[in-house]
């Protein structure tokens, strides 16, 4: 079998060789059949083709070297133009220019790409100059929008870089970097308020798809009102700790500024920062400082406070409102707030924080004393009955005073009598019935 296979392979190789010889013979026959004049003309044509190819090769090589030199020169120009410091400016408007509207100067080193007409820009620099740029610079026009902060060359005014958005330093300080340690389990007697706040603020951020499926638009904000010491700020801190959203805490008295328009600018910057870092929660404490009912006044300070509140109304449900930014407001004087703040579409969910009842007082006392060394024979129900009309802050003071009394007496554990003495200590400070509303 091996001998037959070798013979077949030899026959195939001979057939392939004969076919190659036939091809060579065919070429040789064609050349042999041609005359001398035809061969000379073919040779001259080939030589001309070679000369044309060589000249084309030389031209392309020269163009390549020229383009490399231009690229190197342009890179040096770009590096020189990008040398710091930049001149800071703002984009006023982006324009679409037609070819017949721009007069492009003719020069020897300009090509079709350099004279290409596209988008132009109007900018305003920090030196209060308004400048028109036929060529924008190193930033793509699609990335620029009116109002953007930019860095321009101080000589040619070409846009070199797009700078990050500028916010007031006071607004940046409002962002809570370290999350609070409070949890919902640290709040006693407010289970209904916790559930409603979770449904209105946290749930739309964590499970937005459920709201979209049902076609329900979640509330934009939540207003917490009630007497002092009932846990409004504590619940807001727990909400910040349990949610993964950016949390901005601002007190309404911070928004009352001396200069006209300064408070409204703080409100705009706070909401702009929240939109940039969305989802976000803005907590406004002591809302009654800026949210009082509007009235006619000749004092500039009163008018400035009202302008600040109007800016807050615009941010809550104006053209620039954002569903990914939730607002939590807290106040002790809900009766003095402007009706425009309380209407639906702004602060939709209203949560009342009343004084805790007897069952809630038991839960609050247990929460504040769970890390304390206490006896097992403490009657929490009796302590709750003895602390009628106490708010959560006063109940915490009772636990602190009981611990101080036990420490003063040298005891190693806090018993029921210590708590009763603590109640008397807090009661002496409460000289009269607390009235927080006029």
Swiss-Prot record:
Residues 1-24 are annotated as: Disordered. The keyword Nucleotide-binding applies. One of its GO terms (cellular component) is cytosol. It is found in: Cytoplasm; Nucleus. Keywords: ATP-binding, Cytoplasm, Nucleotide-binding, Nucleus, Proteasome. ATP binds at residues 226-233. SUPFAM superfamilies: P-loop containing nucleoside triphosphate hydrolases (SSF52540). One of its GO terms (biological process) is proteasome-mediated ubiquitin-dependent protein catabolic process. The keyword ATP-binding applies. GO terms for molecular function: ATP binding; ATP hydrolysis activity; proteasome-activating activity. Pfam families: AAA (PF00004), AAA_lid_3 (PF17862), Prot_ATP_ID_OB_C (PF16450). Residues 11-22 have a biased composition (Polar residues). Belongs to the AAA ATPase family. The 26S proteasome is involved in the ATP-dependent degradation of ubiquitinated proteins. The regulatory (or ATPase) complex confers ATP dependency and substrate specificity to the 26S complex. This is 26S proteasome regulatory subunit 6A. It comes from Schizosaccharomyces pombe (strain 972 / ATCC 24843). The lineage of its organism: Eukaryota, Fungi, Dikarya, Ascomycota, Taphrinomycotina. The gene is tbp1.
């Amino acid at each position: 079998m091996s001998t037959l296979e070798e013979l077949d392979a030899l026959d195939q190789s001979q057939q392939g060789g004969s076919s190659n010889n036939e091809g060579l013979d065919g070429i040789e026959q064609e050349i042999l059949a041609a005359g001398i004049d035809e061969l000379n003309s073919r040779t001259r044509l080939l030589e001309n083709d070679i000369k044309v190819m060589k000249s084309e090769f030389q031209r392309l090589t020269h163009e390549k070297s020229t383009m490399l030199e231009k690229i190197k020169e342009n890179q040096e120009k770009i590096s020189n133009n990008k040398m710091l410091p930049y001149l800071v400016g703002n984009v006023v408007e982006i324009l679409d220019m037609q070819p017949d509207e721009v007069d492009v100067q003719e020069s020897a080193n300009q090509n079709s790409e350099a004279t290409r007409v596209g988008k132009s820009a109007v900018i305003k620099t920090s030196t209060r100059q308004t400048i028109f740029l036929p060529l924008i610079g190193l930033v793509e026009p699609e990335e620029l929008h009116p109002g953007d902060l930019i860095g321009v060359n101080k000589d040619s005014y070409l846009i070199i870089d797009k700078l990050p958005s500028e916010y007031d330093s006071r607004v940046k300080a409002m962002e809570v970097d370290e999350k609070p340690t409070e949890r919902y389990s640290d709040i006693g007697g407010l289970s209904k308020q916790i559930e409603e706040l979770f449904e209105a603020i946290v749930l739309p951020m964590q499970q937005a798809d459920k709201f979209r499926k049902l076609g329900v638009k979640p509330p934009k904000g939540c207003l917490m009102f009630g007497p002092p010491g009932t846990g409004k700020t504590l619940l807001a801190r727990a909400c910040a700790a349990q949610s993964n959203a950016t949390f901005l805490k601002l007190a309404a008295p911070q928004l009352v500024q001396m200069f006209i328009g300064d408070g409204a600018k703080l409100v705009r910057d706070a909401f702009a920062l929240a939109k940039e870092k969305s989802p976000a929660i803005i907590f406004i404490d002591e809302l009654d400082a800026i949210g009082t009912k509007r009235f006619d006044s000749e004092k500039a300070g009163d008018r400035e406070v009202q302008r600040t509140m109007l800016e807050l109304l615009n941010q809550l449900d104006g053209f620039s409102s954002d569903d990914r930014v939730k607002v939590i407001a807290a106040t002790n004087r809900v009766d003095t707030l402007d009706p425009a703040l309380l209407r639906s579409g702004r602060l939709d969910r209203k949560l009342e924080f009343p004084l805790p009842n007897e069952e809630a007082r038991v839960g609050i006392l247990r929460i504040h004393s769970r890390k304390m060394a206490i006896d097992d024979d403490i009657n929490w129900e009796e302590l709750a009955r003895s602390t009628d009309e106490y708010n959560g802050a006063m109940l915490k003071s009772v636990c602190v005073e009981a611990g101080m009394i036990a420490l003063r007496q040298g005891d190693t554990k806090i018993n029921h009598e210590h708590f009763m003495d603590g109640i008397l200590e807090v009661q002496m400070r409460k000289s009269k019935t607390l009235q927080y509303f006029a």
